[in-house]
A protein has these predicted regions:
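Charged, alpha-helix-forming regions
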Residues: 1-123
């Protein structure tokens, strides 16, 4: 997997959202974000080899392999807010809608929350 990634986020999202993520959680989100293509109309199920995924998020200790489900579970619990400056409304949303570990193939499937589409697609 190429380690030169480009991540695109809307300026609105950057200015009007607040979230608190650990370094590993940030790396997961940025790695996953880099798989979103500019022409994508919808989020996909992003499948990554677990060994490559651990390397990409900077986990070198193989004992962390067993901690990866804990890291993604904690990430799925992280709710953040996106504020609408015009209406005063705000959205509370989690980054991920699903994570599936496929032990037989050594892969992990990750899915962004569909509520993030306006902030990450068609930019």
């Amino acid at each position: 997997m190429n380690q030169n990634f480009v991540v695109t986020k809307s300026n609105y999202f950057i200015k009007n959202s607040s979230y608190d993520l650990s370094l590993e959680e940030q790396r997961i989100i940025l790695t996953l974000s880099s798989l979103v293509q500019p022409e994508d109309q919808d989020f996909k199920v992003y499948t990554i080899k677990i060994a490559e995924f651990l390397e990409l998020i900077g986990v070198v200790d193989q004992s962390k392999y067993t901690e990866l489900p804990k890291i993604t579970r904690e990430l799925m619990k992280k709710v953040f807010e996106i504020n609408d400056e015009v209406t005063g409304d705000f959205l509370q949303v989690a980054w991920l809608s699903a994570v599936k570990y496929k032990k037989s193939s050594g892969e992990i499937d990750l899915e962004f929350s569909p509520h993030l589409k306006p902030y990450m697609l068609n930019l």
